[in-house]
């Protein structure tokens, strides 16, 4: 019988060497956590931080965000896939929270049981499984694994999830590989691997290893081989290493580079407050 807990720890140990630096420690109000999850799905931490900062600084306050058009909100997610879909979910979240509480606060979710909190999040239209699980794990500390599409692709390649599993199914499968206390660190390093632009194509569904070779007991050895091949290809192409940066694909199927650019977050605030109004010309 495969001891997935031990394999999960060994995987994290290997990924820490590949992607050095501390895993981010997120402490946000529940509403901000939910909005951040929308930024983070299928993106790198750097991209998510940039988009989240834009979200809080590009509009006068959260009410202006709530009443803005999808087109206006989508500009916040420039450089990420599915910008309109992210904008749609942001607006749905803000509509739900404001109409329920008549303010932009959602801290009551922390006081609910996992069952009741999950039911409440399901009432917000069009949230993804990742949005819900990230919020439940971050705000309530529950034993759920926030897994998005790219992370699922990587988990299947590793052999930790079965071929064809959806992110929701993979999240349940991965629980056996991670202790509750280790979920944030495990999820962070799995994300680093999943969005690495050198590797993301290797994890695409059509390129997954067969069931016979996608053995979780050999995943570290296979990963080390993949790292060497990807690094050699990058050196041959004259590219510098850029682990942890997400590959963003445009509508025509081409990849475009991503940076930490975009609007500077000149103003930040708690999700319940508002930034000072900008001067208008």
Where are these regions (language model features)?
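Catalytic DNA-binding helix-loop module of base-excision-repair DNA glycosylases/AP lyases
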Residues: 34, 38-39, 90, 113-159, ...
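Compact, basic/aliphatic-enriched, mixed alpha/beta core segments that act as assembly/interaction modules
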Residues: 143-145, 149-210
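N-terminal polyanion-binding entry modules of DNA glycosylases/AP lyases
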Residues: 1-111, 181, 188-281
């Amino acid at each position: 019988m495969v001891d997935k807990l031990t394999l999960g720890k060994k995987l994290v140990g290997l990924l820490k060497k590949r992607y050095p630096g501390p895993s981010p420690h997120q402490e946000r109000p529940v509403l901000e956590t939910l909005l951040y999850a929308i930024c983070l799905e299928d993106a790198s931490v750097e991209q998510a931080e940039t988009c989240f900062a834009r979200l809080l600084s590009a509009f006068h306050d959260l009410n202006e965000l709530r009443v803005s058009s999808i087109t206006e909100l989508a500009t916040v997610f420039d450089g990420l896939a599915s910008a309109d879909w992210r904008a749609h979910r942001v607006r749905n979240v803000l509509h739900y929270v404001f109409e329920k509480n008549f303010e932009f606060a959602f801290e009551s979710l922390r006081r609910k049981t996992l069952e009741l909190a999950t039911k409440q999040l399901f009432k917000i239209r069009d949230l993804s499984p990742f949005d819900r699980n990230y919020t439940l794990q971050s705000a309530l500390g529950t034993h759920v694994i926030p897994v998005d599409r790219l992370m699922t692709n990587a988990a299947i390649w590793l052999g930790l999830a079965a071929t064809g599993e959806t992110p929701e199914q993979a999240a349940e499968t991965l629980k056996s590989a991670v202790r509750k206390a280790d979920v944030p660190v495990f999820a962070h390093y799995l994300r680093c691997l999943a969005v690495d632009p050198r590797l993301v194509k290797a994890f695409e569904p059509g390129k997954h290893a067969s069931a016979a070779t996608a053995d979780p007991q050999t995943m570290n050895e296979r990963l080390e081989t993949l790292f060497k091949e990807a690094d050699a290809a990058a050196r041959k192409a004259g590219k510098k290493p850029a682990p942890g940066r997400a590959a963003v694909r445009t509508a025509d199927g081409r990849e475009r580079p991503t940076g930490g650019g975009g609007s500077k977050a000149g103003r930040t605030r708690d999700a319940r407050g508002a930034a000072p109004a900008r001067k208008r010309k």
